[in-house]
From Swiss-Prot:
This is Probable cobyric acid synthase. Catalyzes amidations at positions B, D, E, and G on adenosylcobyrinic A,C-diamide. NH(2) groups are provided by glutamine, and one molecule of ATP is hydrogenolyzed for each amidation. CDD domains: CobQ_N, GATase1_CobQ. It comes from Methanopyrus kandleri (strain AV19 / DSM 6324 / JCM 9639 / NBRC 100938). Keywords: Cobalamin biosynthesis, Glutamine amidotransferase. SUPFAM superfamilies: Class I glutamine amidotransferase-like, P-loop containing nucleoside triphosphate hydrolases.
Length: 494
């Protein structure tokens, strides 16, 4: 086994991107490769083959590597829950909700041991590991408990590549400062540096590159130009800030809940031609001409529902449904659509307290104190009149159990559903309102197409091509071009 690790001078430098393209490159060269990010902080997660949670970014990298997503690709996942606390997930299962200080006290117990175990398993099963760090490896105030960067590289015996985003300015100083701040034993692990997201004349960089090589004794491995045609899942809320809704005639309004999660669910909609997906802040108004309104997942269903009430958006959602606009709730959004939410666990309210839902579905969701989180892959057949008979697959990540006499949306062949009954979701027969626990449902091409046709009143026409499959195919080609434009193949032994 050999290993390579990308670390960055800062967040959003391009580590995930370069890890993904390297996985895709090695896969196409016939190498058995696996991604690895020891610790990730993300609200976008999915369910791995072991029915445990991992970050969507590592699931995507696994797909680029030609592997089925595994809990060992991301052994520690931190999911922010507000008030400076995060849910800590180790090997796919939650071990508690903690502040950062509390987490630091136990980081070398279950979390670090899980990292070492996963690294060993991947090393035994694959020829190459492509690892990714988090943030910067030179955060000197937390180096003693950093299990996401060079401590991991040391354990893997990985060659480390430092990545800097040159589009933001300050990249030369960032490379120099990062390496200089590292302890000597970790500085020796850095085998080269890359500039990412470059636009312009590369020859202008040469004097600075030569000076960095002279001062640091570290090799320059190349510059990756800004790439606009490589599809990467939205990893964090910053992606929503830069997301352009486009000019499509079919308008989908996704409410940007304060603690929105799994907004990658809606990327396939945004990839379709003539479809406009916009994320609407609760402080704003829903567009009057929206063809569909979607309430997405959230880590704090009750708190986010109260925020909608505070802003008056709850009334706008109900009005939209009354006027015939399709309203869909996914996971936490589905729970909000019901008439009541009961917090038996005391996670957001005092134990046993409840709040009214939007009342668009005759459903009650209970957050029980004696039941754990559901994390499971699911598949089934849709029951809705406009979507009936469509086979779908996805995954469930939820703590609530929903009780309803409304018709079910999906009859599951595998999974959990509303309350372990193999019936998922619900819909109204007299209004276009529906809800589901299935994340990833829009990655099912036929469901996506029929949904768009329905909400648009038949004016949307599906393309002959599969936009998601086409994007993946394009990714593989772009990956070859990117890696071969640098000195990475030499470092990889290719």
């Amino acid at each position: 086994m050999s290993a390579i690790m990308f670390v960055g001078t800062a967040s959003n430098s391009g580590k995930s991107f370069l890890a993904a393209v390297t996985c895709a490159y090695l896969r196409q060269r016939g190498v058995d490769v696996a991604p690895f990010k020891s610790q990730n902080m993300s609200l976008n997660s999915c369910v791995a083959k072991e029915n445990g949670e991992i970050a969507v970014a590592q699931a995507f990298q696994a797909a680029m590597a030609g592997q089925e997503p595994s809990i060992h690709h991301n052994p520690v996942l931190l999911k922010p829950k507000g008030e400076l606390r995060s849910e800590v997930i180790v090997h796919g299962k939650p071990i508690g909700t903690m502040s950062y200080r509390e987490y630091r006290e136990i980081v070398f117990e279950d979390p670090w041991q899980a990292v070492l175990e996963s690294a060993e398993i991947l090393s035994e099963e694959h020829e190459v590991i492509v690892a990714e760090g988090a943030g910067s490896p030179a955060e000197i105030n937390v180096l003693d408990t950093d299990i996401a960067n060079l401590r991991v590289a040391e354990a893997l015996g990985a060659d480390v590549i430092l990545v800097a985003d040159i589009s933001r300015g300050g990249a030369f100083a960032a490379v120099y400062g990062t390496i200089e701040l590292l302890p000597e034993r970790w500085r020796r692990l850095i085998k080269g540096f890359l500039f990412n997201k470059f636009l312009g004349d590369e020859s202008l960089l040469e004097p600075g590159i030569k000076e960095l090589e002279r001062r640091l004794g570290v090799r320059y491995l190349g510059t990756v130009r800004h790439v606009g045609d490589f599809w990467m899942p939205w990893e964090d809320s910053e992606a929503l800030d830069t997301h352009s809704p486009g000019r499509g005639s079919v308008r989908i309004a996704v409410i940007r809940l304060p603690r929105i999660s799994n907004f990658t669910d809606f990327e396939p909609l945004a990839m379709e031609p003539d479809v406009r997906v916009e994320f609407v802040d609760p402080r704003d108004n829903l567009p009057e001409d929206a063809d569909a309104v979607i309430l997405p997942g959230t880590r704090t269903t009750i708190s986010d529902l109260e925020e909608l009430r505070k802003r008056g958006m709850d009334e706008e959602v109900v009005q939209a449904a009354d006027e015939g606009t399709v309203v869909l709730g996914v996971c936490g959004g589905y729970q909000m659509l019901g008439r009541e939410l009961v917090d038996e666990s005391g996670g957001e309210l005092d134990p046993g307290e409840s709040v009214p839902g939007l009342g668009l579905l005759d459903a009650v969701t209970v957050f029980p104190s004696d039941a754990g989180k559901v994390t499971v892959r699911s598949e089934g057949v849709v029951n809705h009149p406009h979507l009936r008979g469509i086979r779908v697959e996805g995954f469930e990540i939820h703590e609530g159990r929903t009780y309803t006499d409304e018709p079910h949306l999906v009859r599951l062949r595998s999974g959990y559903g509303n309350r372990g009954c193999f019936l998922d979701g619900a819909y109204r027969t007299d209004r276009p309102v529906l809800g589901t626990y299935l994340h990833g449902i829009f990655f099912n091409r036929r469901f996506r197409h029929e949904f768009l046709r329905w909400v648009s009143g038949g004016r949307w026409k599906p393309p002959e091509r599969d936009v998601v499959r086409e994007a993946v195919k394009r990714n593989l080609q772009v990956a070859l071009e990117i890696v071969e434009s640098t000195d990475l193949p030499e470092l990889l032994g290719e």
